[in-house]
Amino acid sequence: MTESESAAVPVDAAAFREAMSRLASAVHLITTDGPGGRAGFTASAVCSVSDAPPTLLVCINRASSAYAALTQNGTLCVNTLGEGHETVASLFGGRTPVDERFAAGTWRRLRSGAPALADALVSFDCRIVGRHAVGSHDVLYCAVEAVAASGQADALLYSERRYRTLPRAPRSGSAPAEPARAARAVGARPAEGPALALRSA
């Protein structure tokens, strides 16, 4: 077998998931509300596409319980979580009924009407402007129409199948801070989490 032929052999899905579990990712709640109903899920597959115009990329499994509402509403809010949000992240990442998911937080509405978590580190209110199917998922291109930053907690990360926190950096000009701390694990490994955002509840 030549080197090029060897490279063409598909990577085992389990091996890929294990490799991806070693990447530390921010944790987000993706929420929506509108004609298709209220829904939400926990995701780590979120990133910036452009700042001209401001655009985010969000991935969702087409088997997700939130998929129908999200696509029908055409809007969503990306709520980036911080320390103390482990419970709500786990609720939105499992099979918890929708009403119980939203009962775990305090919500407000931004421009689109999608629920924005009041104490999220930051909430990006978006309109879905493009969609591309890749395997089991849709890649959504989301135009950011409003931003609300209110949370002051350390960032919440998901790595090695558990939640961890990353301390905030000191502001420029502030008093000398303690030596930088490594990201620390938070609580027990959750039964469900954002995983790779390859699977969304």
Curated annotation (Swiss-Prot):
SMART domains the UniProt entry points to: Flavin_Reduct (SM00903)
A Pfam family assignment: Flavin_Reduct
Keyword NAD: yes
Catalytic activity: FMNH2 + NAD(+) = FMN + NADH + 2 H(+)
InterPro entries, alphabetized: Flavin_Rdtase-like_dom (IPR002563), NADH-dep_flavin_reductase (IPR050268), RutF (IPR019917), Split_barrel_FMN-bd (IPR012349)
Keywords: Flavoprotein, FMN, NAD, Oxidoreductase
EC number(s) recorded for this UniProt protein: 1.5.1.42
Keyword match Membrane: no
Gene3D superfamilies: Electron Transport, Fmn-binding Protein, Chain A
GO annotation, biological process: nitrogen utilization; uracil catabolic process
Biased composition, class Low complexity, residue ranges: 167-195
Entry GO MF terms: FMN binding; FMN reductase (NADH) activity; FMN reductase [NAD(P)H] activity; riboflavin reductase (NADPH) activity
Region (Disordered): 167-201
Top-level enzyme category: oxidoreductase
PANTHER family: FLAVIN REDUCTASE (PTHR30466), FMN REDUCTASE (NADH) RUTF (PTHR30466:SF1)
Matching HAMAP family: RutF
Protein family per UniProt: Belongs to the non-flavoprotein flavin reductase family. RutF subfamily.
Biological role stated in the UniProt entry: Catalyzes the reduction of FMN to FMNH2 which is used to reduce pyrimidine by RutA via the Rut pathway.
UniProt protein name: FMN reductase (NADH) RutF 1
Underlying gene: rutF1
